[in-house]
Structures are given as C-alpha cells and as structure tokens.
C-alpha cells in the first residue's frame, strides 16, 4: 500500500514542528489546539475546560509526587545445562563435582538498588546489555511477581498497591506493537476509547487525540497507516512516538519506558526524548532505560542511574558525572560524551580482575558524603496548595487539576473552610459493553483492510467443497453409495476443523498487543474473549453456507429443505467448535509453527476416534474417553442421522446384498439363484425387491444409537463455548506479564 503522506520522511520538518511548541506542557498544548479550533470553527468551549482541567495563565500547577525505591533485590534460579553425566543418578551422587554442577544456581539481577525521582523529571537507567536496566524498570512498574522481588517502592512515602499502580501508570514496551492496517489517528482514537471514561463525550476524546498528535509531533503522519512488511507505513521514529502516545492518552502520573530510543537514529531518538520531556513537565514522573544517549538527549535527562551486573555504580544528575569520575580517579575529557565515557569505563572494569567492585564501593561512599554534607537531601514535595495529603488525596487532587483523565473520579467533600478530595479508583475506565464494542470495531476495521485473509479462507472452503462434490457426484442409494456417503461425511466434517487452523496466527499476532493493553487495565480479558468470538462468528456463517451450497445438491444428500437447514447448522457448529479449539490452543502455544503441529496431530486423533475408521464398540476401553472427546464424532453422527434417519427408505434390496463382496461380480442370474437358496435356508421369502437394509439399520451398524442429531448439534456448540472459556482462563493465568 502506498504511503499516504509522502512528507513523513522529512525529519527536519518534524523537528521544526517540535521546536515550535518547545516545552509546552500537555495543558498548554490542549489550550493551543482549542484556540486554533475555536478560531476555525467558532467553538466557544476550550478543550482544557472541556476536560475539566484547571489552568492559571496556561500553566497547570501540578500536585507534587515523589517516587522512591529502596533496596530492590531480585534473584532468579538458573537451571544447569543438560549434561550426559547428569542423566545417571548414581554417578551424580558419587562424584561431588557433578553433584555440584547439577544443582540449580541463583543469579542476582538486582542487588540493593535504591533511588528516587519526582514529577517533572526524567530518570534514565543506563548500563550495558545484561546490566539490569529492563529488570529495574519492571521492578518499579510492578512487573515482577510478589515474593520474587525484595525491597519497597513508594509514592509520596506510601507503598504502591498493584491496583492503584495500574490506574496511575503506563508502561511502554521496547517493541512497537501496533495494528498494521490502522492509521495513526485511528490507533490513538481506539486507545482513547479504552482509557478515557464514557462520561467524556466522543467529541472531546477526538480533541484529546488531536492535541496528543500535535504533542507527539506526528501531525503529518496522522492519516497514514502504521504499516508492516507488506504495507508501507510510517517511519520507525513515528512508530515509537505512536507507541508512547497510546500509553499516555490518559495522561498518567507514572510513565515507564523500556529503551524507547532503541533502533532509532540520533535525530529520531532526540525527538522521542523531547516528547518525554514535555510529558514530564505536564506533571508526570518519567522513568526509562536507555542504552547510550547522545549529547543532546543527555541534556534532556534529569537523573541517571548506571547499573553494572545488577549493582548501582552511579546515581545522580548528569551534571555531577564529571565530578564523580574525577574523584574516582578517571576524569572525563572535556570533549567526551559523558555517558559514553562512563559506559566504556564500566565495561573495562567489568572485564578486569576486580570487576566493578571498587566503583560500587566508591559510589556508596560518595552518596554518603553528599548526604552528610547536605548537598543532596532526600527529595520532598515542595510547598504546594495541597499540604499533608495522603496518596489517594494527592491523586484525586491531581485528577481535578487535569491529570489522569481515566484514573478515577475525584469527589469533593467539606464545607466552607475545607477543600479535600477523596478518590474512587475504578479498575477499568469503561463498562464491559463499551470495551466489547470498541474491541470489535477495531478488529473488524483491521480485518476489513486485509480482505485477502478472508478471501483465502473462503476460497479454500469452496475449492474443497467443489472437489468433494465432483468426487462424490450424485451418490445413489446402493450399498456402494452408502459406503461413499460415509466417507464423504467423515472427510467433510474433518475439513471443517482443519480449515479452522487458519485462525491460529490471529491471536498469536495480537498476543503482545493484548498483554500490553491488559497489563494496565485498558480493558477486561473477558471483553477480549467475547469480542473475539463476536467478530469471528459472521465469517463462520459465510464459510458454512458456501460449503453447504457447494456440496449438498451435488452429492445428492437427502432431507429436502429441512435437511439442508440442519446440514448448514451442523457445519456452522463444527466451524464454531473448531475455531474455538484453535483459539484456545493459540493462547497456550508460543509459536505458529508449534501450534500448527499440535492442531494437525490432535485433529488427526479426533478423526481416528470419530467412529468412521473403527466402530465405537471396537475401540479399546482405555481409549474410549478419546472417542467422547473427539470434536469430529458429534458432527459426524449428526449428519449420518440427518441422512439415514428415514426408516422407510431402503438402501439394500434383494441381490444388492452381495454388493461390496466377491459375489458381487457374479452374473445377475447367479445372484438370483443364490438369493433363492438363502431364502430357503432362512425360511423367509426374499425377492429382488425385498428391502434388507434401511437407514435405521445403517445407523445401528455404525453404532450411532446413543444421541439424537439435535443432541449432537448442541454438544458441538457446547464444545465451542467450553473452549472459549478455557481460552479465557489461559489469558487470565498466562498473561500476567510478570517475571517470576
């Protein structure tokens, strides 16, 4: 797909756009956007007033927040490598060396990390790969399971609860996980629908998105699709800013970012950090990991923490770096990038015999000296119009001043002399039906712009139906016709499930988007499951009708219109249960390749135990449970009953009894003589027109006697709901997005 806005590649134009708004806070930017729109369309209601934001001469006086963390320690168990010697228990116990190497080892990823930062600041965590940067960000963002992380994380001196943190914070992952066929504006609008409350009118949500687009400096790319390998879209720097915009749409108090400048050139990286600086100035605490900032990026940072193999080797402002390393004995040259010099020195020390132990100890002494000399006192909120507020009251006051649009509802209390607020913190910004509606709309919009995906599915169903129709063309009611009908039904019903395997990559492609959005309560997991089912169902109806119309009359199936209706219903139920089963597996398997392997294997077992290859009465007792778990069994038995339920219809008459046997090759005269001999032996008159096998007899021969066709239909549908419920629990248990 051609790029919609050709000017998006002009980074200098974007940089000028950013420079033009310079250090405007979000509140100022909203006001500017409102004024422009008011002049253009005569709107008399400023955006900042519409969002209930209180400004004084364009500047929002934010409520102060201080985030502190003390003695954060995180250890993980490292399993020993598989060794041939470890496979023998006797040798492992006899050889102390082998026994020692076989025991799991503990690796320390964070070792007593402490620090603090406040609103209006950007704190950057630096270090080489494996130093613990991302681990520290995860620890502060509550992405490490309780019990695994030691230490405390506090906001304004109060321990942060998990539910509260989800509401007031946002986390931007290192990878840009976006829907490729949505435009930038649509992507941010859907984020606004999720994170902003229903009480905010849609018109004001749109203005919020437009203001954010201007703040991010991506106005020229607003109508451009995100793009992927097959569709040209926005640039890497723009994708990164869109990813940030998704998570700051509700103006969070805490913003965590994992290497937001990774993979970007110096200009794009500077523009991204420039955006983060304005976010911080709007009253947020911004904490990010960064690999190697340029000189310009360093000028935007307020606090630095250097890590080396889980230890703090420096904590302080960028301005204090030269003095720190001078006192350590390694002065930074004048024209040298401070952070590059520090990182290079740390790498050299890590490769030396003593490691960074000396630098770690020096940092501890240096921090103590600064505290004793009172040069760096602990951060405390400055004087503000909100003294002595609890954390919830401070958050409520911050909401009333314009922060955290979806974070809660501040409720004023008090009389003439008091102006305190309390906070009602909702777990989610919107009710479930709004979430389902928004999720469904987004999924359908993304799918509608990729019609080739549905086209491939319906083409495969129609082609398969056409092949079956030509192979099993107009089957008669002879014994051969009965046998061919059984083969057609077995293959047709299994085809429904194999076709559903195409749905496997859908959730696997969306998995990390889902994990990012649900990690901070953008929507409920149950809403996603219901939306997923709602969006997929219409396509299943089209597939069912297409297959039924292609095969029903061509094969010569019986039952008339009522038989056709049931045939369509059981095919639809098969598609439903098959897609639900594949959807459940997509929540379990880690990759598409493994998923396809498992789906093909399990569906083969379902077909084996369906009753076509081996009668139910012949299945061993230790495998009979698989017969009842087979998804192919119930649709197969249902279509058999739909075809052979007429007890008056005959399928074997007179000499046809010899068909499908060696005697079937005899001349008709010989068959009649044999039939007469059999009649005399049995004492029953059997003529050439005597009906010997009806549809009911065929059902009994196939062992289809336990359930009616409607019961089989209901069980097939129930299997679909069962696997959707299992899918929900896999999301609930498997998408905690936390380290163990």
From Swiss-Prot:
Q: Which residues cross the membrane?
A: 453-473, 488-508, 529-549, 563-585, 594-614, 713-733
Q: Where does ATP bind?
A: 127-134
The UniProt entry, under SMART domains, shows: AAA
Main location class: membrane
Q: Which UniProt keywords apply?
A: ATP-binding, Membrane, Nucleotide-binding, Transmembrane, Transmembrane helix, Transport
**One MF term from GO for this chain?**
ATP hydrolysis activity
The protein's superkingdom reads: Eukaryota
Q: State the InterPro entries in the record.
A: AAA+_ATPase (IPR003593), ABC2_TM (IPR013525), ABC_transporter-like_ATP-bd (IPR003439), ABC_transporter-like_CS (IPR017871), ABCG_transporters (IPR050352), P-loop_NTPase (IPR027417)
The record's annotation in Pfam families points to: ABC2_membrane (PF01061), ABC_tran (PF00005)
Q: What does the record say about its membrane topology?
A: Multi-pass membrane protein
Span of domain ABC transporter: 82-334
Q: Where in the cell is it found?
A: Membrane
What does the sequence similarity comment in the record state about its family? Answer: Belongs to the ABC transporter superfamily. ABCG family. Eye pigment precursor importer (TC 3.A.1.204) subfamily.
Q: What is this protein called?
A: ABC transporter G family member 1
Upper classification of the source organism reads: Eukaryota, Viridiplantae, Streptophyta, Embryophyta, Tracheophyta
């Amino acid at each position: 797909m051609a790029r919609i806005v050709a000017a998006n590649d002009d980074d200098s134009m974007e940089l000028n756009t950013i420079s033009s708004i310079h250090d405007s806070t979000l509140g100022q930017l909203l006001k500017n956007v409102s004024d422009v729109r008011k002049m253009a369309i005569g709107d008399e209601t400023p955006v900042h007033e519409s969002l209930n934001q209180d400004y004084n001469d364009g500047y929002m006086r934010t409520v102060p927040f201080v985030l502190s963390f003390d003695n954060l320690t995180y250890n993980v168990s490292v399993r020993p490598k598989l060794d041939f010697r470890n496979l023998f228990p006797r040798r492992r116990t006899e050889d102390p060396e082998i026994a020692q190497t076989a025991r799991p080892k503990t690796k320390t990823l964070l070792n007593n990390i402490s620090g603090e930062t406040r609103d209006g600041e950007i704190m950057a965590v630096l270090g080489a790969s494996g130093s613990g940067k991302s681990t520290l960000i995860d620890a502060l963002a509550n992405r490490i399971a309780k019990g695994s992380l030691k230490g405390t994380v506090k906001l304004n001196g109060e321990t942060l609860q998990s539910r509260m943190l989800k509401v007031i914070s946002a986390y931007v992952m290192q990878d840009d996980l976006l829907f490729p066929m949505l435009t930038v504006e649509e992507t941010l609008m859907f984020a606004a629908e999720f994170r902003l409350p229903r009480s905010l009118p849609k018109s004001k949500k749109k203005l919020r998105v437009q203001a954010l687009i201007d703040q991010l400096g991506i106005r020229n790319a607003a109508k451009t699709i995100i793009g992927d390998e097959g569709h040209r879209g926005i640039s890497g720097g723009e994708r990164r800013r869109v990813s940030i915009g998704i998570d700051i749409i509700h103006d969070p108090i805490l913003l965590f970012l994992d290497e937001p400048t990774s993979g970007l050139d110096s200009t794009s990286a500077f523009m991204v950090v420039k955006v983060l600086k304005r976010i911080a100035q709007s009253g947020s605490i911004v904490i990010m990991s960064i690999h190697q900032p340029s000189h310009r990026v360093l000028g935007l940072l307020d606090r630095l923490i250097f890590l080396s193999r889980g230890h703090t080797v420096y904590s302080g402002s960028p301005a204090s770096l030269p003095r720190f390393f001078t006192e350590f004995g390694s002065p930074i040259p004048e024209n040298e990038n401070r952070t590059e010099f520090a990182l290079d020195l740390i790498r050299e020390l890590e490769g030396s015999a003593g490691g960074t132990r000396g630098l770690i100890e020096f940092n501890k002494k240096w921090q103590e000296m600064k505290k004793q000399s009172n040069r760096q006192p602990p951060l405390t909120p400055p004087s503000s119009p909100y003294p002595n507020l609890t954390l919830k009251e401070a958050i409520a006051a911050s909401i009333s001043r314009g922060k955290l649009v979806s974070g809660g509802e501040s409720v004023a209390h008090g009389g003439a002399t008091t102006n305190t607020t309390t906070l009602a913190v909702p777990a989610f910004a919107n009710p479930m039906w709004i979430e389902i509606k928004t999720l469904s709309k987004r999924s359908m919009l993304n799918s509608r712009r990729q019609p080739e995906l549905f086209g491939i599915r319906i083409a495969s169903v129609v082609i398969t139906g056409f092949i079956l129709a030509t192979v099993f063309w107009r089957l008669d009611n002879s014994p051969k016709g009965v046998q061919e009908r059984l083969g057609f039904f077995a293959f047709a019903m299994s085809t429904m499930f194999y076709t559903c395997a195409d749905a496997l990559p859908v959730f696997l492609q969306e998995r990390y988007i889902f994990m990012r959005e649900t990690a901070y309560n953008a929507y409920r997991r149950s809403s996603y499951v219901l939306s997923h089912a709602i969006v997929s169902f219409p396509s299943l109806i089209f597939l069912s009708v297409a297959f039924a119309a292609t095969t029903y009359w061509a094969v010569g199936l019986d039952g008339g219109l009522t038989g056709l209706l049931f045939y369509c219903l059981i095919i639809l139920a098969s598609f439903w249960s098959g897609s639900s089963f594949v959807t459940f597996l997509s929540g379990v398997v880690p990759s598409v390749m493994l998923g396809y392997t498992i789906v093909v294997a399990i569906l083969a077992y379902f077909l084996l135990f369906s009753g076509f290859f081996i009668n139910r009465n012949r299945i061993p007792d230790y495998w009979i449970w698989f017969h009842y778990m087979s998804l192919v069994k119930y649709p197969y038995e249902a279509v058999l009953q739909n075809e052979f339920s007429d007890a008056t219809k005959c399928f074997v008459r007179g000499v046809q009894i010899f068909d499908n046997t060696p005697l079937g090759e005899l001349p008709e005269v010989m068959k009649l003589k044999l039939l007469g001999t059999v009649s005399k032996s049995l004492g029953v008159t059997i003529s050439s027109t005597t009906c010997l096998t009806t549809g009911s007899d065929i059902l009994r021969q196939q062992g289809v006697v336990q359930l009616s066709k409607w019961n089989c239909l209901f069980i097939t549908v129930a299997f679909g709901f069962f696997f959707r419920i299992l899918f929900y629990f896999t999301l609930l248990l498997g998408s905690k997005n936390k380290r163990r």
